[in-house]
Amino acid sequence: MASTVMSSLSLKPTFTLEKTSVKGLPSLARSSSSFKVVASGVKKLKTDKPYGINGSMALRDGVDASGRKPKGKGVYQYVDKYGANVDGYSPIYNTDEWSPSGDVYVGGTTGLAIWAVTLVGILAGGALLVYNTSALAQ
């Protein structure tokens, strides 16, 4: 009797899942469409001269520090190809973008008060955390 029961059992699972679609629910099945990533073009900076300190080479007697005449083969030969920032000097501000009223804080007194209250709150919160985790709180 045990042998007939064992022979009727299959060792391989025969679990099958039928695909059913429910109206209004999105399908979780993967589509066979291909995924392609395309990089955008290089953004060139348009400025009159490169940002770095050596944007224009003004050498005494027409020679560099080692006594050689420049051939124009430095990084600045690529200014027209890659844009002005070819020397790796990347300022966080540009004098052309400065505010004309840069000597006055735009936020005014209210902005300074909000900034001060935020700073005091952060410092007080840190002090409270230190106090609560120390032996003084017990």
Swiss-Prot record:
Record InterPro entries: PSII_PsbR (IPR006814)
Localization (cell): Plastid, Chloroplast thylakoid membrane
Gene Ontology CC: one annotated term: photosystem II oxygen evolving complex
Range annotated as the organelle transit peptide: 1-39
Keywords from the named record: Chloroplast, Membrane, Photosynthesis, Photosystem II, Plastid, Thylakoid, Transit peptide
Main location per the UniProt record: plastid
Induction: By light.
Pfam families linked to this entry: PsbR
GO BP annotations, alphabetical order: photosynthesis
Stated role: Associated with the oxygen-evolving complex of photosystem II.
Family (UniProt): Belongs to the psbR family.
Protein name listed in UniProt: Photosystem II 10 kDa polypeptide, chloroplastic
Taxonomic source organism: Solanum tuberosum (Potato)
Gene name as annotated: PSBR
